[in-house]
Amino acid sequence: LVAHEENVRVGKDEGFAKAGGLSRLPLEAGESGTATFNVR
């Protein structure tokens, strides 16, 4: 969760790129979706 929050704070471009990488990890789709949603 901390990583997601930091990625969102980093910025839109980096946030999206990192969010895509984190999506590969065994995390719930809801968490990834929330992170991406916040980036938008």
From Swiss-Prot:
Optimum pH is 6.0. One of its GO terms (biological process) is cellulose catabolic process. It comes from the Eukaryota. Keywords: Carbohydrate metabolism, Cellulose degradation, Glycosidase, Hydrolase, Polysaccharide degradation. It is an enzyme of class 3 (hydrolase). Its EC number is 3.2.1.21. GO terms for molecular function: beta-glucosidase activity. Optimum temperature is 45 degrees Celsius. Coiled coil: none annotated. It comes from Passalora fulva. This is Beta-glucosidase 1. It catalyses: Hydrolysis of terminal, non-reducing beta-D-glucosyl residues with release of beta-D-glucose.
